[in-house]
Amino acid sequence: MNKRKITNPFNVKFKPFNNYGSPIPGMSWHKITYSEKTGQGTYLLKMSPGAKSKFHKHTNFEEFVMLEGELIDLDNKIFKKGDVVTFKPGSKHFSYTKNGCLILVFMRSRNKLINK
């Protein structure tokens, strides 16, 4: 029996990104192996032009690959197509996009929201 799953990131259906309880405007996702219970796994994240993530803290490593577009981090560092980005445990930030982006995200645990 084959237990393989193939996902084409450019041909999937996205749903509103609600990983923190309620949807974040301009953000949608497609879960590949991600478990909301454990916060572990992989998902595709699509951010529309002008979308901004919530301020949060990483409780474990998070890595992602920029598939399309650009993402701007809290310190104004710009992540571009092809970049592989690693956030270490304890990292605190939010990100936004001016023109939209598509990201392949690898999570090892759930992030914690920071009220600011």
Where would I find each of the regions flagged by the language model?
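A short, N-terminal "cap"/entry segment at the start of jelly-roll beta-barrel domains
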Residues: 1-38
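Structural motif
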Residues: 40-42, 64, 101-102
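Short glycine/proline-enriched turns and hinge-like loops at secondary-structure junctions
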Residues: 57-59, 77-78, 97-99
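Ligand-binding loop in jelly-roll beta-barrel domains
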Residues: 89-114
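Conserved short histidine dyad/triad with adjacent acidic residue
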Residues: 28-58, 88-92
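Glycine- and acidic-residue-biased ligand/ion/polar-headgroup-sensing regions
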Residues: 49, 58-74
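Short acidic-glycine-tyrosine-enriched beta hairpin
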Residues: 73-93
